Curated annotation (Swiss-Prot):
It is found in: Secreted, Extracellular space, Extracellular matrix. GO terms for molecular function: alpha-L-arabinofuranosidase activity; xylan 1,4-beta-xylosidase activity. It catalyses: Hydrolysis of terminal non-reducing alpha-L-arabinofuranoside residues in alpha-L-arabinosides. This is Beta-D-xylosidase 3. Residues 1-23 form the signal peptide. Expressed in flowers and siliques, in the early stage of seed formation and not at seed maturation. Detected exclusively in the endosperm of very young seeds when the embryo is at the globular stage. It comes from Arabidopsis thaliana. Disruption phenotype: Reduced seeds size and delayed germination. Its EC number is 3.2.1.-, 3.2.1.55. Belongs to the glycosyl hydrolase 3 family. Involved in the hydrolysis of arabinan. Can hydrolyze (1,3)-alpha-, (1,2)-alpha-linked side group residues and non-reducing terminal L-arabinofuranose residues of debranched (1,5)-alpha-L-arabinan backbone. Also acts as a beta-D-xylosidase, releasing D-xylose from arabinoxylan and xylan.
Amino acid sequence: MASRNRALFSVSTLFLCFIVCISEQSNNQSSPVFACDVTGNPSLAGLRFCNAGLSIKARVTDLVGRLTLEEKIGFLTSKAIGVSRLGIPSYKWWSEALHGVSNVGGGSRFTGQVPGATSFPQVILTAASFNVSLFQAIGKVVSTEARAMYNVGSAGLTFWSPNVNIFRDPRWGRGQETPGEDPTLSSKYAVAYVKGLQETDGGDPNRLKVAACCKHYTAYDIDNWRNVNRLTFNAVVNQQDLADTFQPPFKSCVVDGHVASVMCSYNQVNGKPTCADPDLLSGVIRGQWQLNGYIVSDCDSVDVLFRKQHYAKTPEEAVAKSLLAGLDLNCDHFNGQHAMGAVKAGLVNETAIDKAISNNFATLMRLGFFDGDPKKQLYGGLGPKDVCTADNQELARDGARQGIVLLKNSAGSLPLSPSAIKTLAVIGPNANATETMIGNYHGVPCKYTTPLQGLAETVSSTYQLGCNVACVDADIGSAVDLAASADAVVLVVGADQSIEREGHDRVDLYLPGKQQELVTRVAMAARGPVVLVIMSGGGFDITFAKNDKKITSIMWVGYPGEAGGLAIADVIFGRHNPSGNLPMTWYPQSYVEKVPMSNMNMRPDKSKGYPGRSYRFYTGETVYAFADALTYTKFDHQLIKAPRLVSLSLDENHPCRSSECQSLDAIGPHCENAVEGGSDFEVHLNVKNTGDRAGSHTVFLFTTSPQVHGSPIKQLLGFEKIRLGKSEEAVVRFNVNVCKDLSVVDETGKRKIALGHHLLHVGSLKHSLNISV
């Protein structure tokens, strides 16, 4: 039956607020876990590893030298056992902070003192904002709340987030955790979020606020699809795709974000488990990229490469292979159980173990774990009062608003006018959703505001479920009756974790069960505007709704976090002008019917009827394209500055001086001697808001290169989000590096500068640029 709902908060919200108030009045706080408590044990003051005035290297060397082999092995696992004789407590490495402090992993938990933490939108929606400042701001709040929880013994300091895998296939259950399908967006998200988590207020590179971890390295984007399982999947990836699609976010994490950790994945890449591949770990992460931190396995990965993948004949051999490849920390206990046996069998020596635990200890020292009482350190004043603050919760609301994508708006049907809507029908399986809004890898939110509650704060709203998300059985008749009696309808449908999640990929792109029938029949009966809200991580084939004239507006809201209902209402009623853009392609169902999820190739193969993947390589039909979006205003672009010609100066003996070349290596003296002070040039654009209301707008700079080396159809060079008032204009500047930004990856995985005609794209503008020698 339909029911009136003007609830401002749920009962659980009121209870949570009550608990917070009580806990603030309590002086019985738990203590954080830390080493070198010289106040409690003055004898520790003479230990060099407890001397914060020494270099981290000197302290680590001293500590490792004091440990027995058995004690060393205890620090190879995520539940480090500690050494009481040296004043080192046990420590749980595994905490998560994908979009807020989580209680997944055991390293962090919620208690009476801190019963919840701010739950921001799931990453895919935050990425849709294309706002680098927002990415970093969220990371900073999450790390502040984490430190506050650590100070009362409720959290660790090492967080295995973010997930920067490429959202390669629309069926992937974990696509919701990622920044989307584009390497440039994913890289910028990775760097900004990592900096938000890690950077200290003092800016000391040898100190960490918390330690972030970029995962899952590498080419991991399938969980469980038609009996293809991540634990046994061998990702066959050519060097070209590895270099220009799968690796860039991880490289950016390490090189530009200075992340403290990288997690290797379950899958194999070209026949080798990533956690036992010395080329990927020691060669690339620590060698080429110079990781300052530790490499951790996904949980049980070393056990998996032995028991599931049969890459090692014995557990001891599996441990040895992982340590010798460059793995420092094993999530779970496998390496702790079998490392001693590996040493005794001569498969690995103690030096390899010393190297691994040294990286782990160095990270903890940068966090201040070995500096004594954290309450006397930089963030020692943080506590429960700094978690779930009004500002933090407002940022969660604003983050959701900035990410929401308006996909259809017939005849300007949105925003709705509150004064014109006397009765609003709110219908659908996600219309009164709570936990669904916060996706996965979440904690306990400060509070929930459901879509129904958010809308009901503005206009009189009547609710009808229609069906649950699976929508096997539906009460469509009651929903139709309600729609027919209301001035406007908001339908909130889509997915939840039963449809898409870790360990569960989708098999099709249809709305679940009878949801399409529910939407179509409700829209047919409605006598006013019909707003379709899709709550999901991945895209759906909603061609039926796109073409249905009775459905006047469509919005995608991802999983919008604890304040999702408020953000949705802000957009629907015009308090916020939508400015999000899709971070991934929405494909038709026909696409997944002919493309196996297990095919890792990004580029099309016409001879096999393979269409390729992502906007960079796929030219077929889409439901909605990457970066698609509408807004309540209009923005015009005018190109002010960009070169027509870039000349590269080659050495006298360079072979391309005497013969015609299609491309050059993207390294060498010619990369320093191009026009405009090196290999850089600037693109300036004037952007004007020509509409009748203020709004934010993302300016995208794309490029199309000459078709050599299977180069992308187009690729994103950069983006900038700006806010303009009515009739306001501003200049947006992009700095373009020829060798970095205009290069493509060849078939061997090397970067090349394509010579000849390039196109720069901004909106409908196209600018020709020629690169010559």
